[in-house]
């Protein structure tokens, strides 16, 4: 893989998601787990450590491809602060394009910018 062009990547920094109180939608199962299985959060540390195996931020340094990352700053499903935790750990060539007024939705012309980036291959 030489080029990578994620748009609002998912599964970044689960702990940050919890701190932002965004345990709904895709993360609703987390709230359910704590409510039904661990109401005092006695096993919270272990819970997030296990999720670390699939957390993008923990694998970002292994990505060798050139990355063109795009995100909407109003995204509540994949919050930018959680995405930044992965983006900042990328060690190769990278570029980020931010869309201040957009959330987790179709952003005009993003397909064009991705295709322009991928033409480098």
Where do the PLM segments sit?
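Histidine-bearing beta->alpha loop at or near hydrolase active sites
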Residues: 93-117
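Active-site nucleophile elbow and catalytic-triad environment of alpha/beta-hydrolase enzymes
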Residues: 42-59
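Short, conserved loop/helix-junction motifs that constitute active-site signature segments
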Residues: 61-63, 90-91
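Generic beta-strand/beta-sheet core signal
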Residues: 7, 70-72, 99
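Hydrolase active-site cap/lid region
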Residues: 1-42, 106
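Short alpha-helix in the alpha/beta-hydrolase fold that links the catalytic acid
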Residues: 65-67, 79-88
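Acidic catalytic loop of the alpha/beta-hydrolase fold
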Residues: 73-78, 104
